[in-house]
């Protein structure tokens, strides 16, 4: 028992000494950016033009102010197959100049299991967006029992050098499952 306690004390001391090395940091450093605010994308509700992308801005990441008088900044009827979009997620690309946004292509008045698509958007000025509707059920075989495609998000995968889109899908009576795919270089597919 005494040997075990001595070993544990020695092991604990060695582990603690690793964290106490002078001048050593376990944090990854990131290059400083001269960005001055945070942009938040959101939708406001479940009816009419509430299912549309809006912008808000924050200087501290906690308090946000709606832009454009809290009106949509992108016409949902133009970019979607259903006439509405929800769950916007925006990402500044690695080049620092391009923005990708993904949204759920859905009008909730049609039912919570009525959508089969997402929309991929690309912009360099946050005003003018190119868009591409990805209808999973129409594009890929074996999706006959697909009920919904929800809440896509995008991240950059540095190991692959591509942008990954991940989202939730529900088939039949099962549970929602998270799927992912790498977008093409144009962010259209």
Language model: regions and residue ranges:
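Bacterial N-terminal signal peptides that target proteins for export
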Residues: 2-11
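Bacterial N-terminal signal peptides
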Residues: 11-20
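Beta-rich carbohydrate-recognition and catalytic domains
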Residues: 26-149, 155-189
């Amino acid at each position: 028992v005494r040997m075990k306690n001595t070993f544990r004390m020695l092991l604990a001391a060695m582990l603690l000494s690793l964290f106490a090395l002078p001048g050593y940091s376990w944090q990854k450093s990131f290059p400083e950016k001269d960005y001055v605010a945070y942009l938040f994308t959101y939708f406001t509700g479940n009816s009419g033009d509430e299912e549309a992308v809006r912008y808000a801005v924050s200087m501290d990441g906690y308090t946000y102010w709606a832009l454009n008088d809290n009106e949509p900044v992108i016409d949902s009827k133009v970019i979607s197959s259903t006439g509405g979009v929800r769950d916007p997620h925006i990402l500044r690309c690695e080049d620092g100049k391009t923005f990708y946004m993904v949204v759920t292509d859905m009008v909730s008045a049609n039912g919570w299991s009525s959508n089969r698509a997402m929309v991929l958007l690309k912009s360099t000025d946050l005003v003018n967006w190119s868009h591409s509707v990805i209808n999973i059920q129409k594009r890929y075989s074996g999706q006959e029992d697909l009920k919904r495609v929800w809440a896509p998000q995008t991240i950059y995968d540095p190991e692959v050098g591509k942008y990954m889109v991940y989202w939730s899908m529900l088939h039949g009576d099962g549970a929602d499952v998270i799927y992912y795919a790498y977008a093409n270089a144009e962010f259209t597919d």
